[in-house]
């Protein structure tokens, strides 16, 4: 039987406005840093995301270097997004960030325009 999110998932979570943007974020977000790499079984990652969402956690925080190894957290979350959350995408806030070394050479780290654009493109492909 396919997983169905809890009907009461928004009843107990506190949501706070983000500045004057109108966006509301849950008081707790799920960060996918060291718990979403290749060393964590995929089913455990799925369970974490499902449980978080059932508790009203709608913000999933990633980065291009999360894993380990770098990038694997975005890849794993992308698989879960397609398999479990495909019909729920409009209920989620997914953030990613860039800044740390990802590839060799002078353009593989920090904040140059080239690095940020390439990192965004790569993150979108992984997810």
What role is predicted for each listed range?
Residues 76-80, 93, 97, 115-122:
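Generic beta-strand or strand-like secondary-structure segments
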Residues 52, 97, 126:
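Conserved catalytic core of Hanks-type protein kinase domains
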Residues 84-111:
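Structural motif corresponding to the early beta-alpha repeats
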Residues 103-127:
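Glycine/proline-rich, positively charged
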Residues 1-93:
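N-terminal binding-site loop/beta-alpha segment at the start of enzyme catalytic domains
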């Amino acid at each position: 039987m396919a997983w169905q999110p809890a009907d009461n998932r928004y009843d107990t979570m506190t949501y706070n406005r983000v500045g004057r943007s109108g966006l509301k974020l849950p008081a707790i977000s799920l960060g996918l840093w060291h718990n979403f790499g290749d060393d964590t079984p995929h089913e455990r990652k799925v369970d974490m995301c499902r449980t978080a969402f059932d508790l009203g956690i709608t913000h999933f925080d990633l980065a291009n270097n999360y894993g380990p190894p770098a990038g694997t957290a975005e890849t794993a979350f992308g698989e879960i997004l397609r398999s479990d959350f495909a019909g729920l995408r409009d209920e989620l806030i997914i953030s990613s960030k860039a800044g740390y070394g990802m590839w060799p050479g002078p353009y593989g780290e920090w904040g140059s325009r080239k690095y940020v654009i390439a990192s965004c493109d790569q993150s979108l492909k992984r997810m």
